Swiss-Prot record:
HAMAP family: DAP_epimerase. The lineage of its organism: Bacteria, Bacillati, Bacillota, Bacilli, Bacillales. InterPro entries: DAP_epimerase_AS, DAP_epimerase_DapF. One of its GO terms (cellular component) is cytosol. It catalyses: (2S,6S)-2,6-diaminopimelate = meso-2,6-diaminopimelate. Its main location: cytoplasm. Belongs to the diaminopimelate epimerase family. Substrate binds at N14, N73, G83, N84, N170, N206, E224, R225, G234, T235. Catalyzes the stereoinversion of LL-2,6-diaminopimelate (L,L-DAP) to meso-diaminopimelate (meso-DAP), a precursor of L-lysine and an essential component of the bacterial peptidoglycan. It is found in: Cytoplasm. This is Diaminopimelate epimerase.
Length: 328
């Protein structure tokens, strides 16, 4: 039996339990045990309301990194990256170490994180690097008849929609659609198919449908691999922003407002001297509550104390809903 203390967090209402492995004395846990705990704690029928996954925070042995983030989805699978989750981990570690910027180790890269100017309503806001960005098949296993998929119709997937695929570093399949397609069940059917046994994306893929709102704003809805539909997916919003900029030949560094069912973020991009692209995701890092559970064969709630931050965030959500309603 173990008593586990947590912080319930969210980025764009993509919610997680943040668990500090060192403070909870669970650094020796196996991946199997981490997965089992995630499956049980993240169940939406649990008294704590469940979550999209667990963010395990640990010490890093990489030079310059102040900590390590490991993401386990609600189904027990491991996510190589989570942009919304990283913002909350960035806040947790920066506050813990009394810093305003640092580096955090993720599965595929050591990424820059920093405190940022609030996007509104004094909501705690953080900026995190999203990289590496790759289009090559080695980073994005797919069998759709092309090595690089950019704005192309793949009849096996859909007769009309043009798709792009990119890894950041988890895999994303992206298409731009109108409201009629958004209102249909096309995304759910396609994403469910591509995240079950299929000949096109053997490891599954995050599937995003994107609607243009204006020159400086898009709306993104994502079916996440291992989770399903979520309020928002940070890496998806970053990837969709990049594809939009490439399609429109926009300046990479210009901030793009990205709206989603969970709120709003901003994304910028840059290309270094070698041609490699990195993205910057800017958005909320909200701490919803702190509490503890007892973990043995089941996970039992012991304590759970709410903060005032979620009420604060709802002001932004109402602003977003009004914007989406009036923009159409």
């Amino acid at each position: 039996m173990a008593i586990i203390h947590f912080t319930k967090v969210h980025g764009s209402q993509n919610d997680f339990f943040l668990v500090d492995e060192e403070e909870n004395h669970i650094t020796a846990w196996s991946d199997t045990k981490r997965a089992d705990f995630a499956i049980k704690l993240c169940d939406r029928s649990h008294s704590l309301g469940g979550a999209d996954g667990i963010l395990y925070v640990a010490k890093s042995n990489k030079a310059g990194a102040i900590g390590q983030m490991r993401v386990v989805n609600s189904d027990g699978s491991i996510a190589s990256m989570c942009g919304n989750g990283l913002r909350t981990v960035a806040r947790y570690l920066l506050e813990k170490h009394a810093l305003t910027d640092a580096k955090v180790e993720t599965m595929k890269a050591i990424l820059d994180v920093r405190k940022a100017t609030s996007l509104g309503f004094d909501i705690p806001t953080y900026q995190v690097e999203i990289s590496p960005v790759k289009f090559n098949p080695e980073s994005l296993p797919m069998y759709v008849g092309v090595e690089k998929l950019f704005n192309q119709v793949i009849p096996e997937l859909d007769e009309e929609l043009a798709f792009s695929a990119v890894s950041v570093p988890n895999p994303h399949l992206i298409t731009f659609v109108d409201q009629t397609v958004l209102d249909s069940d096309k995304q759910e059917k396609l994403a469910s198919f591509l995240n079950s046994e299929n000949p096109y994306f053997p490891d599954g893929v995050n599937v995003s449908f994107v609607k243009r709102l204006n020159e400086d704003a898009i709306y993104v809805r994502t079916f996440e691999r291992g989770v399903g539909f979520t309020n928002a997916c940070g890496t998806a919003m970053s990837a969709c922003s990049l594809i939009k900029k490439m399609l429109d030949q926009d300046t990479l560094e210009t901030p793009l407002n990205v709206y989603n069912d969970g709120g709003r973020v901003q994304v910028t991009a840059k290309k270094d001297e070698t041609g490699d692209i990195s993205l910057q995701l800017i958005g909320n890092a909200t701490f919803v509550s702190t509490g503890s559970v007892r973990y043995d064969d089941i996970v039992t709630e012991l304590t759970n104390e709410a903060t005032v931050e979620q009420a604060q965030y709802q002001e932004l959500v109402q602003e977003v809903k009004h914007f989406l309603k009036t923009t159409g």
